[in-house]
C-alpha cells in the first residue's frame, strides 16, 4: 500500500475540524485492512520549531502564528491488538501520546529510546508523579542508557516509585512486539556523551522499516547505508541539516550529522525505486526542508527522495 498522510489540525477552527473528520473517515478505510503501520509523530530536531532563542526568518512565522513542528518521533501500531509503541519520548510527548491513543485509537504499550540527547528522552518525565503517575510503563533502553536513567535524578525517581520499568535492549537482537511485528535496535555512531545511540529496524510479515534520526556521518558507521536501504522497504534517515551553511555561528564539528546533500550524493546511483524508499526526518529549525512546500523540499523530491511529514503513515 502506498504511504498516506493523516493531517492532524494544529489550530482550532471549523475548517480544521472538518479536515479532521474527513481524514479520520479516510483513515478508517485504511485501518480496515488491519496491517501494522508506522506513523510519523514529529519531524523536527530536538529543539523543535520554533526554536528557543531563534528570531530568524525560519522561526518568525511560527512565533507569530503559533504553528509548530513537533520533535521527531514515530509510533508503531498494530491494529489487530490495538497496541502502539513510541520510539523516543520527546518534549512533545503529551500531544504525541494523544495522537496515538485518541486519533489512532491504541493503547501505549512501551517506549523505545534511541539515546540521551534532550529531544529523545525528556518526555519520560510526563510519566511521573507530577503529571500522569504512570504504572510500570515499559521503557526499552540499551545498557549505557539504562545506567544513565538509574543513576541520575529525576529519572531514577520514575523507577523508584514505579512509574516506569526498564527493559533491556541488545545490539542487533530482535524483540517480538506482537505476532506480526518485531523490532531490532542497532548501534550507530553519534556523540554519545551520556549513552550509546541506536537506530531501529521494524519488521512485519510483509515489509520492514529502518529509522535512524541521529548519526554522525555515514562513513563512520560499520554498515553500508547503500545496502541498508536496498534491503528495506522504508528508510527514515537523519536529515538534521541540509547543508553546512545553515548555522554559521556554530561549530558544525561539535554537532556532526550527514548533510542531506551528502546523503543524496552518496545514494545518487540508486535507481528511482530505491531512492523513493528514503524519507528525511529530524530537521533542524534552520533546515529549509522542515517546510514541506519549500523550494528545498521540492529539490529533494525532484531527486526522487522524500521529506517526512507529521501524519505520514507507512504500512508494514
Outline where the language-model segments fall:
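Short hydrophobic alpha-helical segments enriched in small aliphatic residues
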Residues: 5-8
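Positively charged n-region of N-terminal signal peptides that target proteins for export
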Residues: 11, 15-20
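Sec-dependent N-terminal signal peptides
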Residues: 19-28
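Core dinuclear metal-dependent hydrolase active-site scaffold
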Residues: 33-100, 166-228, 312-316
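Active-site metal-binding motif and surrounding structural segment of the metallo-beta-lactamase
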Residues: 77-140, 233
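A short, active-site helix/loop in glycosyltransferases that binds the activated sugar's phosphate group
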Residues: 144-153
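Cap/insert and terminal regions of metallo-dependent hydrolase folds
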Residues: 203-208, 215-312
Amino acid at each position: 500500500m502506498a504511504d498516506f498522510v493523516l493531517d492532524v489540525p494544529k489550530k482550532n477552527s471549523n475548517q480544521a475540524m472538518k479536515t479532521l473528520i474527513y481524514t479520520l473517515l479516510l483513515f478508517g478505510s485504511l485501518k480496515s485492512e488491519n496491517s501494522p503501520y508506522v506513523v510519523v509523530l514529529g519531524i523536527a530536531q530536538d529543539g523543535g520549531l520554533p526554536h528557543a532563542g531563534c528570531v530568524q526568518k525560519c522561526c518568525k512565522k511560527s512565533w507569530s502564528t503559533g504553528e509548530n513542528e513537533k520533535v521527531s518521533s514515530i509510533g508503531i501500531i498494530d491494529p489487530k491488538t490495538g497496541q502502539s509503541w513510541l520510539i523516543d519520548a520527546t518534549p512533545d510527548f503529551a500531544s504525541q501520546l494523544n495522537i496515538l491513543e485518541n486519533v489512532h485509537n491504541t493503547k501505549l504499550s512501551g517506549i523505545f529510546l534511541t539515546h540521551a540527547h534532550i529531544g529523545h528522552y525528556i518526555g519520560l518525565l510526563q510519566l511521573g508523579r507530577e503529571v500522569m503517575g504512570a504504572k510500570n510503563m515499559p521503557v526499552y533502553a540499551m545498557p549505557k542508557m539504562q545506567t544513565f536513567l538509574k543513576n541520575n535524578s529525576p529519572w531514577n525517581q520514575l523507577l523508584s516509585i514505579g512509574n516506569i520499568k526498564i527493559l533491556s535492549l541488545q545490539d542487533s537482537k530482535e524483540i517480538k512486539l506482537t505476532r506480526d511485528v518485531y523490532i531490532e535496535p542497532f548501534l550507530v555512531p553519534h556523540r554519545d556523551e551520556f549513552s550509546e545511540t541506536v537506530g531501529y529496524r521494524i519488521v512485519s510479515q510483509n515489509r520492514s522499516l529502518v529509522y535512524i534520526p541521529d548519526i554522525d556521518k555515514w562513513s563512520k558507521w560499520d554498515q553500508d547505508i547503500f545496502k541498508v536501504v536496498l534491503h528495506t522497504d522504508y528508510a527514515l534517515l537523519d536529515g538534521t541539516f541540509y547543508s553546512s551553511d545553515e548555522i554559521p555561528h556554530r561549530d558544525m564539528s561539535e554537532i556532526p550529522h550527514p548533510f542531506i546533500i551528502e546523503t543524496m550524493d552518496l545514494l545518487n546511483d540508486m535507481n528511482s525505486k530505491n531512492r523513493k524508499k528514503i524519507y528525511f526526518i529530524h530537521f533542524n529549525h534552520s533546515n529549509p526542508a522542515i517546510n514541506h512546500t519549500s523550494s528545498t523540499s521540492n529539490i529533494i523530491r525532484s531527486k526522487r527522495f522524500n521529506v517526512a511529514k507529521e501524519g505520514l503513515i507507512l504500512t508494514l
